[in-house]
A protein has these predicted regions:
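N-terminal hydrophobic targeting signals that begin at the initiator methionine
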Residues: 1-3
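Soluble extracytoplasmic regions of secretory-pathway and membrane proteins
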Residues: 5-9, 15-18, 22-385
Length: 385
């Protein structure tokens, strides 16, 4: 009787499973199999699987790389560089044994925390790569276009294929380095506080490790400033005269970007010396460099200086001030449409049109001019010109 009671439940479960399988096959796998058979008939089955799996291979590879970076630094910080017992603990066998036992408990417990944390951080940091995997493929497999940017001398394919990925990679690597620096610093602090019988001074290995991580943060920030230079090429406030950077952009904003790099590097160096030096900690170099860096960033937001440059230098003689930048736009347009091989002939314009009219009268240029039709007269005149 018990088996008979289970039959309706089994029948209902079978129906539900069948419906789920049918829906999955109809909405997901039907197109997949049709495409597979089509590509297989063309002997392109390998390409089909690559096209299908590219996003998962790329996403999985990026996640694995970021997970390895996080896990490696956490593992180094907890295993080797964070423990600094004094000499009396190392010389006494009982104290050394107790210290090692507590340290082992701390390291084994911390690995259970930072392993899933590394995976979670890797997934969060790699999310933009999941969404823009097609651009990443173009970055890896794109070829040179053969056209050179007249401003910075970069290949045109750099701006279409590489520059967007560089912006994405720079942000993700900066987040990764900053998170690592913060969390590894917290891990060293926890080891220093909760593991007993340690020196008050942090070990040399921990300082070197934190300095390296801080160096990565600085490097990625500077890389971001360098990439900001290329954003000046997308300025459109000079249209319809020309597209791209003008006098103010290249003579004011570009030097500010370089000043931002120099002052931020000074902030990083003075901060590192202040944090990691044992003695003679002086605050004023760090404060001065920080104030200079903040001033440079503030100048980018102030509009009075570029407005004055525009009013006093550009507007009185725009051709003289921005002629070279207009030429950049002209050269780029000629390269884009492959017009740089055209022979250019300069015609001398005579202010006296009587001779031109006399010549035209013999060449019958006026036969088809609709002088009676006001609607078409101006268009025909423009065509003749």
């Amino acid at each position: 009787m018990r088996n008979w009671k289970l039959l309706p439940v089994l029948a209902l479960a079978t129906i539900i499973v069948a419906v789920v399988l049918y829906v999955a096959f109809y909405f997901f796998f039907l197109d997949l199999f049709v495409d597979l058979w089509w590509f297989r008939s063309l002997d392109f089955e390998g390409y089909f699987w690559l096209r299908l799996l590219y996003r998962f291979i790329l996403s999985g590879g990026v996640t694995l790389v970021f997970f390895s970076i996080f896990f490696f630094h956490f593992w180094i910080a907890s295993r080797y560089l964070g423990l600094n017992p004094p000499d009396d603990v190392l010389l006494d066998a009982d104290k050394r044994r107790r210290f090692q036992r507590f340290a082992d408990v701390f390291m084994n417990g911390s690995i259970k925390i930072y392993t899933p944390l590394s995976l979670l951080l890797a997934i969060v940091v790699a999310i933009p790569f999941y969404e823009q995997w097609e651009q990443a493929l173009l970055f890896f497999f794109g070829e040179s276009s053969g056209l050179v940017d007249p401003v910075y001398g970069q290949n045109a394919s750099f701006y279409m294929l590489s520059y967007p990925i560089y912006m994405l990679i720079q942000q993700e690597l900066l987040y990764t380095a900053a998170i690592l620096f913060l969390l590894v610093g917290i891990l060293y602090w926890l080891e220093h506080v909760f593991v007993p019988n340690q020196n008050q001074e942090y070990p040399l290995g921990a300082k070197i490790h934190l300095t390296i991580l801080m160096g990565f943060v600085v490097m990625f920030v500077i890389w971001g400033f360098i990439l900001d230079r290329y954003s000046l090429l997308y300025v459109s406030n000079h249209e319809p005269v020309f597209f791209g950077p003008g006098f103010v952009d290249m003579r004011f904003y570009l030097p500010l970007i370089w000043l931002s790099i120099v002052t931020f590097l000074a902030v990083a160096i003075t901060a590192g010396l202040f944090i990691f030096s044992k003695k003679h900690r002086i605050k004023w170099p760090f404060l001065v460099s920080l104030a200079l860096f903040g001033s440079v960033l503030g100048l980018e937001k102030v509009k009075i200086i570029p407005d004055l440059m525009n009013q006093l230098i550009v507007q009185p003689n725009p051709v003289e001030a921005e002629g070279s930048f207009m030429k950049y736009n002209i050269d780029a347009t000629l390269d884009a449409y492959d017009l740089n091989k055209i022979k250019i002939i300069d015609y001398q314009v005579s202010l006296d049109a009587s001779q031109d009219i006399k010549d035209w009268s013999t060449k019958k240029h006026f036969e088809n001019i609709p002088v009676w039709d006001r609607e078409f007269l101006q268009d025909v005149y423009q065509q003749l010109q």
